[in-house]
Amino acid sequence: MTTPSTAPTPAPRKAEVSRNTAETQITVKLNLDGTGKASLSTGIGFFDHMLDQIARHGLIDLDIQAKGDLHIDGHHTVEDVGITFGQAVAQAVGDKKGLRRYGHAYVPLDEALSRVVIDFSGRPGLEMHVPFKSGMIGTFDSQLAYEFFQGFANHAFVTLHIDNLRGDNAHHQAETVFKAFARALRMALEIDPRSAGVIPSTKGSL
């Protein structure tokens, strides 16, 4: 009598990355196969709220602790969180075998609608078109959303397209962008059982 074989348990896709400069001290811990739990402290309330959307809608367990030169402004903190988050995602993804690779999502919030498309291509690039209706959202400079996603794309080695298709409220615009990013990321990071152990590229590498 033969014993049925069982599939090997996949290795947990977790990472911890720290970044320490004269401007910021940041630690990111994540589990790509989590349930959306978050512990976030950047000193910028609205930014924490947006990072929470990534965790919740991306089903990523996310712990980000950041201290930065907020007496100047939020630029270094937001950009460096994006960089460190990108590095952590790249580390957790590993060789990309079995990865769906591509992800996309549309997310509405009242009058606002955003679309995000992501490709774990190994070729960093960001195309972002979000005409924010206000320069500030609470204490968050809306221009810094670009810096966050630029830092992420460059260090996660992804191609990222972000478009706000409509919106009259800057808070709604930002929230749809971050939620759509989370949903697209969640899709791209899924492991496809039909291509387990296979890198999703005809080149054989990414």
UniProtKB/Swiss-Prot annotation:
Subcellular location: Cytoplasm
Known pathway: Amino-acid biosynthesis; L-histidine biosynthesis; L-histidine from 5-phospho-alpha-D-ribose 1-diphosphate: step 6/9
The keyword Lyase is assigned to this record: yes
Record key words, sorted: Amino-acid biosynthesis, Cytoplasm, Histidine biosynthesis, Lyase
EC number: 4.2.1.19
Gene Ontology molecular function terms on file: imidazoleglycerol-phosphate dehydratase activity
Predominant cellular place of this UniProt entry's protein: cytoplasm
Region span, Disordered: 1-21
GO biological processes: L-histidine biosynthetic process
Catalytic activity: D-erythro-1-(imidazol-4-yl)glycerol 3-phosphate = 3-(imidazol-4-yl)-2-oxopropyl phosphate + H2O
Top class in the EC scheme: lyase
Gene Ontology cellular component annotations, sorted alphabetically: cytoplasm
Residue pairs linked by disulfide bridges in the UniProt entry: none
UniProt similarity note: Belongs to the imidazoleglycerol-phosphate dehydratase family.
Protein name per Swiss-Prot or TrEMBL: Imidazoleglycerol-phosphate dehydratase
The organism of origin for this protein: Polaromonas sp. (strain JS666 / ATCC BAA-500)
